[in-house]
Amino acid sequence: MQLNSTEISELIKQRIAQFNVVSEAHNEGTIVSVSDGIIRVHGLAEVMQGEMIALPGNRFAIALNLERDSVGAVVMGPYADLAEGMKVKCTGRILEVPVGRGLLGRVVNTLGAPIDGKVPLEHDGFSAVEAIAPGVIERQSVDEPVQTGYKSVDAMIPIGRGQRELIIGDRQTGKSALAIDAIINQRDSGIKCIYVAIGQKASTIANVVRKLEEHGALANTIVVVATASESAALQYLAPYAGCAMGEYFRDRGEDALIIYDDLSKQAVAYRQISLLLRRPPGREAYPGDVFYLHSRLLERASRVNAEYVENYTKGEVKGKTGSLTALPIIETQAGDVSAFVPTNVISITDGQIFLESNLFNAGIRPAVNPGISVSRVGGAAQTKIMKKLSGGIRTALAQYRELAAFSQFASDLDDATRKQLNHGQKVTELLKQKQYAPMSVAQQALVLFAAERGYLEDVELAKIGDFEAALMAYVDREQGELMQQINQTGAYNDYIEGKLKGILDTFKATQSW
């Protein structure tokens, strides 16, 4: 075969013309130390605070300490095979998690990867875990309720859409049970739920997921998990990841509810990271920015106005407000609410529900202490019927507590005092409620009406629970339409008052409890 020199030169020219030098600029550094999930990297001059650093083996770390000649970063995942001298790169990206409706009904880890063994995740994009909270002008006042299904909470400590209400108490006082029942109660309300489990046992979380599924609430819920066996970095970031998933619904004119269970464990994880990064410790060895840790998270829970939603969706959604309601949980030690983290979160939130171990052990469940529990903005969100009928409950309980303490020392009590004590005991008994049995607005209203109008005074204390159960069965059977009407409108007028009175008069006459 004979080669033509002209052809060869043309071929070479063609190849030269086609040759394209692709240059890739990236900021590269070297690991100088690895210990306890923390790496120190030399040479990353242009790294950002919170930036993802690419590590060998398709892993990454997050830059938290930017020092003069090195960067302190926390590894997201296993770090046993990392060694000094390994090369790492800047990615130019902040940590993002998948968001969207495809996450509903799924159990995911902090990074948004599914861990429930089901089909691959479908999502509508990614959202940064750290986001700036909506400004004052973009917000709207809280005036719509979130019904927890608990009589004691919805009557005395009402929660509104866009509110932050702290659930605080010692271990084993029913904090998680209250939050999970609030999720179960949203299954028909249209409110999307996010449950963030931080530092809990995997078996406990599996039980929660099973209960949500049994009660038909999992399809409406995203469960974000950072178990006790996972790294402190994943436990620290889990609430922010869950919040980003909740903001997806808020920014599109929908309502969402997020539970952080619990922020005490997140603060401990952050303290661990900060001490390993050699940051100076402060009170209780927490770093100086532990208040900011929780404030920047909880400020993202808000109710945004229709203009914000319209601008965010570029006009696709009009005339709708969005909300993200937060129920953070804090665990106290022996009822000490003056510790560092509890006082911080109390000052950030719009109210708190105190659960007490002595009430829990006395069989009063939910173990809410109405004297020191408060909702600062939820009162404006209560439905008309609940506002009208719940007013006397808090007063009755306050008077009962005062008189109960006094009556221990008094030998003879007048009739008025004895009547008040009896009424207080009946109301306390009436507010008891079993787990996984949330009540509708109409059911709560009927029970509160019975308490306020004296229908319980001649019912034995031990029979109050039976009275309530029989009453619920009776109205479901005889007055389903009225109950449906109250649930839909939340209104209270002379007609509804007369109907409730008629129901209770007829039911009392049957003596069927």
Curated annotation (Swiss-Prot):
Source species, domain of life: Bacteria
GO cellular component: plasma membrane; proton-transporting ATP synthase complex
Cystine residue pairs: none
Enzyme class of the recorded protein, top EC level: translocase
GO molecular function: ADP binding; ATP binding; proton-transporting ATP synthase activity, rotational mechanism
The keyword Secreted belongs to this UniProt entry's keyword annotation: no
EC number(s) stated in the UniProt entry for this protein: 7.1.2.2
UniProt subunit comment: F-type ATPases have 2 components, CF(1) - the catalytic core - and CF(0) - the membrane proton channel. CF(1) has five subunits: alpha(3), beta(3), gamma(1), delta(1), epsilon(1). CF(0) has three main subunits: a(1), b(2) and c(9-12). The alpha and beta chains form an alternating ring which encloses part of the gamma chain. CF(1) is attached to CF(0) by a central stalk formed by the gamma and epsilon chains, while a peripheral stalk is formed by the delta and b chains.
NCBIfam families associated with the record: atpA, PRK13343.1
HAMAP family for the chain: ATP_synth_alpha_bact (MF_01346)
Protein name: ATP synthase subunit alpha
Organism: Sodalis glossinidius (strain morsitans)
Lineage, highest ranks first: Bacteria, Pseudomonadati, Pseudomonadota, Gammaproteobacteria, Enterobacterales
This protein's encoding gene: atpA
